[in-house]
Amino acid sequence: MTTTPKEREPKVKVSVDVDPVPTSFEKWAKPGHFDRSLSRGPKTTTWIWNLHALAHDFDSHTSDLEDVSRKIFSAHFGHLAVVFVWLSGMYYHGAQFSNYSAWLADPINIKPSAQVVWPIFGQEILNGDVGGGFEGIRITSGLFHLWRAAGITNEFQLLCTAIGGLVMAGLCLFAGWFHYHKRAPKLEWFQNVESMLNHHLAGLLGLGSLAWAGHQIHVAIPINKMLDAGVPADQVPLPHEFILKPALMKEMFPSVDWGIFSGVVPFFTLDWGKYAEFLTFKGGLDPQNGALWLTDQAHHHLAIAVLFIVAGHMYRTNWGIGHSIKEILEAHKGPFTGEGHKGLYEVLTTSWHAQLAINLAMVGSLSIIVAQHMYAMNPYPYMGIDYATQISLFTHHMWIGGFFVVGGAAHGAIYMVRDYDPAVNRNNVLDRVLRHRDAIISHLNWVCLFLGFHAFGFYVHNDTMQALGRPQDMFSDTGIQLQPIFAQWIQSLHTSAIASTAPYVGASVSPIFGGDVVAVGGKVSMMPMVLGTADFMVHHIHAMTIHITVLILLKGVLFARSSRLIPDKGKLGFRFPCDGPGRGGTCQVSGWDHVFLGLFWMYNCISIVIFHFSWKMQSDIWGTVNADGTIEHITGGNFAASAININGWLRDFLWAQSVQVINSYGSALSAYGLLFLGAHFVWAFSLMFLFSGRGYWQELIESIVWAHNKLKVAPAIQPRALSIIQGRAVGVAHYLLGGIVTTWAFFLARFGALG
């Protein structure tokens, strides 16, 4: 009997190269080994600057996209290793030097501390009393609150987690080496976007959320339930006991049969009501600890897991079913968009700068959204009454978001200069935006002027009227009202429409929109925020600073390759000081210079946001609840009357609230006083770089070198003044560092002193 021979199975696709790059410590030990001119060693002091500028600029090391991709991939593992080491350090501090157990027993009266300053020559002033007889530095990272929410009940668990972090760091370092030197992915692996989406959506986000939901259900919820009921932390069963002893869970949530298989039967038989005790839909905040209900969070993570696991199965990989990203993009055309998104698939799979630009813009925006949500819908127990932590987390997420958004514009401009291919982008959305960039930028400029003159004009008007003694003619809640009616409408909608828009939810997402005061231990955790004329005015300042930042950054991207002034700008590269000595008026036009200028406006923008937040919360939200139910706010509700003119901002915010940092000497907060002054100095120091010319310094250096030659101590490496770009980079770095540290010291001394 003969059989038809089966077709030969297609060979398994090999998507890695074996041993592509030898491991050479000898090579790595040579500074600048990645660049031919740098590897020759330093002749002038410019060498060290170029070394830093090019070390991670993989495009300058090689033009091979596959090698660049591998370097980025390997660097990601290195980055993760650094993150794990850093996190491990945080957990180790919690395990070894903190008052976590004491805080867990009394989170209302004891402040978190996880660092004790060792005495130098008997110096003991920096360790303050944080309650419970513990002397240390107060921390404001929110980690204690996160640890409690996760179900960590003692320092030994933190120590184990810290060790786990170091193990993960080691694995990541190994993976970074292994995937560059031993088994390096081919370019096609990096460009296989459907498989990547499946992996990231279903694997990382889907299974990650499912794992976290499982942790919350089996560990965090029962432990927090016991802690909330007053069970001492050392008497709460250990995490694994809740998993291995179903009787413990049955006692708390009797409607489910907590067996390994029987526990999930209701999920697959759609009998979901059985889970209603711990997968809830309460809405709002838990009145006992002022945080989002942990049972709502578990419900959320389970739902998110299901959504992402489904989403991870939408894309076409080995089985010929599902979506193709290229097809989706090429089909995406509107009536006014020409070829639509055609070509963007090629852009995003051949330019990692383009990919990174989008990711940075989105993650930066997400960080800013996180800042807004974390205070209004506090996720962790007792964090809402730790005002120092609330202001720190808000400020942190705003700054991070601002830097990421600017980074998005930076890499967008680098893409335009290094990777943009006109042949790929023919009449698609990107090409069409570039062709009407003049209309976009001129309109955006008009918006900035309109917002700037009007928003600033409100304040100038109010200062003038107040100076002339005419309060009735001021824009205010008691004079000429400018009420934010749309914001107030959204607030009332969120408060009143719950029954019709989300019929199963018990309460609005946050009391900030309206409703009752959530007070914990006599302190306001969250309450309705009343918006008025002062908010309307400062929101238009926010609008102005956001639009100006966008104007600068978008202009940098859209004009990175060419402009009327310099038609061949793309040939000059991403960063250049001016277009040569023959052409005047061509300085500060490079893509890099737009990022440089954009950073200053980002700083302006975020500063005003965090100032507004800090004062508004102290004035209208944060405070103590008296026995008769009245609320005593930290600054007594002075925002509405004082924030409507410039004088009020200077007098009642900057000056009045810097009392604590200025008077901090001789107290446990004295380090903030030193930082406040030191950071002012760093900020002022930046101006020396920003307002000086390169030639001035070169002349000075040559004079100093002459003196060294006279004394026969001339250096072998020739000193050079910083280039124009280097000077600007040093200047903006110190400007931002000085400004941010000044603000940090100002806020923390203030809130540390308030307790």
Swiss-Prot record:
The chain crosses the membrane at residues 72-95, 158-181, 197-221, 297-315, 352-375, 391-417, 439-461, 536-554, 594-615, 669-691, 729-749. It holds the Pfam family PsaA_PsaB. Its EC number is 1.97.1.12. Phylloquinone binds at W697. It is a multi-pass membrane protein. GO terms for cellular component: photosystem I; plasma membrane-derived thylakoid membrane. It is an enzyme of class 1 (oxidoreductase). Chlorophyll a' binds at H680. It catalyses: reduced [plastocyanin] + hnu + oxidized [2Fe-2S]-[ferredoxin] = oxidized [plastocyanin] + reduced [2Fe-2S]-[ferredoxin]. [4Fe-4S] cluster binds at C578, C587. Chlorophyll a binds at M688, Y696. The keyword Transport applies. SUPFAM superfamilies: Photosystem I subunits PsaA/PsaB (SSF81558). Its main location: membrane. GO terms for molecular function: 4 iron, 4 sulfur cluster binding; chlorophyll binding; electron transfer activity; magnesium ion binding; oxidoreductase activity. InterPro entries: PSI_PsaA, PSI_PsaA/B, PSI_PsaA/B_CS, PSI_PsaA/B_sf. One of its GO terms (biological process) is photosynthesis. PSI electron transfer chain: 5 chlorophyll a, 1 chlorophyll a', 2 phylloquinones and 3 4Fe-4S clusters. PSI core antenna: 90 chlorophyll a, 22 carotenoids, 3 phospholipids and 1 galactolipid. P700 is a chlorophyll a/chlorophyll a' dimer, A0 is one or more chlorophyll a, A1 is one or both phylloquinones and FX is a shared 4Fe-4S iron-sulfur center. The keyword Magnesium applies. It is found in: Cellular thylakoid membrane. NCBIfam families: psaA. The PsaA/B heterodimer binds the P700 chlorophyll special pair and subsequent electron acceptors. PSI consists of a core antenna complex that captures photons, and an electron transfer chain that converts photonic excitation into a charge separation. The cyanobacterial PSI reaction center is composed of one copy each of PsaA,B,C,D,E,F,I,J,K,L,M and X, and forms trimeric complexes. Belongs to the PsaA/PsaB family. PsaA and PsaB bind P700, the primary electron donor of photosystem I (PSI), as well as the electron acceptors A0, A1 and FX. PSI is a plastocyanin/cytochrome c6-ferredoxin oxidoreductase, converting photonic excitation into a charge separation, which transfers an electron from the donor P700 chlorophyll pair to the spectroscopically characterized acceptors A0, A1, FX, FA and FB in turn. Oxidized P700 is reduced on the lumenal side of the thylakoid membrane by plastocyanin or cytochrome c6. This is Photosystem I P700 chlorophyll a apoprotein A1. It comes from Synechococcus sp. (strain JA-2-3B'a(2-13)) (Cyanobacteria bacterium Yellowstone B-Prime). The gene is psaA.
